[in-house]
């Protein structure tokens, strides 16, 4: 549920607002929106199964000032528009998507962890945790993703050994073919947490495909 909320908000905003593209799912809608057209070499049966993207305002080209971006369809992996999408850059709190993924796939969500002073010393106050507070690991995913809590990220990573957890984050990236992605901490405070726009899209697509009901 958390993954669905996070991914849905991000991609709906990116496609319909920032870039100005709209998605249509079949040839009937395509003709209705753009007028009757013939696409050479493509059967009507194939067209009915495809998605199309078009600028809602043909006179206004996308104006995205970001240094790097990748907008794609997480259902089929197709690119809609991109700019420097293979450029490696610091990813800050987007790191928490991998933190949540590794935590959900490798840790017992019902185990209890204790909030330590080291966790509370992490930069940022989101989460409103108290010293020696006992909290279920699964419950830490909510402040981690919805509040971008650095304390929650550290609490999760420290539960079974911080270095081991970060190692699992990097191993997961490697297993997904994210060759330009690396993590030095679970929160994204380190500028050495880096990736590319395209590889973050791949990670998001993986999360969508493997999210739990």
Question: Where does each model-flagged region fall?
Answer:
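Short, intrinsically disordered, charge-balanced linker/junction segments flanking boundaries
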Residues: 1, 208-213
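Hydrophobic membrane-insertion alpha-helices, especially the h-region
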Residues: 2-16
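Active-site-adjacent loops and short helices of periplasmic peptidoglycan-processing enzymes
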Residues: 20-198, 205-210
